[in-house]
């Protein structure tokens, strides 16, 4: 079993599939690149936890 401390949350844009390490990076991408209305941002991404050893493979 993987310990919680060895997990990192990542965020994925549902419009283009890009993955980001921070929610701030994702929001900046959605507003500036994808032109998403800031009031509806929650519908355009998903977040999930990955083990630290796999983070660099994903991003």
Curated annotation (Swiss-Prot):
InterPro entries: Znf_C2H2_sf, Znf_C2H2_type. One of its GO terms (molecular function) is zinc ion binding. Keywords: Metal-binding, Zinc, Zinc-finger. It comes from the Viruses. A zinc finger (C2H2-type) spans 11-33. This is Putative zinc finger protein ORF59a. It comes from Acidianus filamentous virus 1 (isolate United States/Yellowstone).
């Amino acid at each position: 079993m993987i310990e919680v401390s060895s997990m990192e949350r990542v965020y994925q844009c549902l419009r283009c599939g890009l993955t980001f390490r921070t929610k701030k990076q994702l929001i900046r991408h959605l507003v500036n690149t994808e032109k998403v209305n800031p009031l509806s941002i929650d519908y355009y991404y998903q977040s999930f936890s990955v083990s630290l050893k796999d983070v660099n493979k994903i991003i």
